[in-house]
Amino acid sequence: MAKKVIGKIKLQIPAGKANPAPPVGPALGQHGVNIMEFCKAFNAKTQDQAGMIIPVEITVYADRSFDFITKTPPASDLLKKAAGLERASGQPNINKVGTVTKEDIKEIAELKMPDLNAGSLEAAMRMIEGTARSMGIVVK
């Protein structure tokens, strides 16, 4: 028989840097999950992606066990890295803060494809281009 799910927790944690401090500790603690066990497993799974923010979806079961699925980093983080930016534009339609090429967009779309609700690579590229425009990044 399948285990009974008592909660799903969604967090965004820097790769390889999960620790019991907020936001991880309180989110897991209220569901009775062993926080250190999660931190060790997450850090081991994401150590090769250092420097990126990794979204994670944790499923907590009635017996206080858990499993988690890591997603691809947010498109905005990947675009900032590709354009070499610290932060996006506060006024994207007025102030353009950087540029990315179509090749950069294609690489990001290929990386994000499993998490995007897109039927084709072209559709995924259009989604990423839209994100870039809303951040004040010019696509060339």
From Swiss-Prot:
Keywords: Methylation, Ribonucleoprotein, Ribosomal protein, RNA-binding, rRNA-binding. It comes from the Bacteria. One of its GO terms (biological process) is translation. The keyword Ribonucleoprotein applies. One or more lysine residues are methylated. Pfam families: Ribosomal_L11, Ribosomal_L11_N. SUPFAM superfamilies: Ribosomal L11/L12e N-terminal domain, Ribosomal protein L11, C-terminal domain. One of its GO terms (cellular component) is cytosolic large ribosomal subunit. CDD domains: Ribosomal_L11. Belongs to the universal ribosomal protein uL11 family. Forms part of the ribosomal stalk which helps the ribosome interact with GTP-bound translation factors. Part of the ribosomal stalk of the 50S ribosomal subunit. Interacts with L10 and the large rRNA to form the base of the stalk. L10 forms an elongated spine to which L12 dimers bind in a sequential fashion forming a multimeric L10(L12)X complex. NCBIfam families: L11_bact. This is Large ribosomal subunit protein uL11. The lineage of its organism: Bacteria, Bacillati, Bacillota, Clostridia, Halanaerobiales.
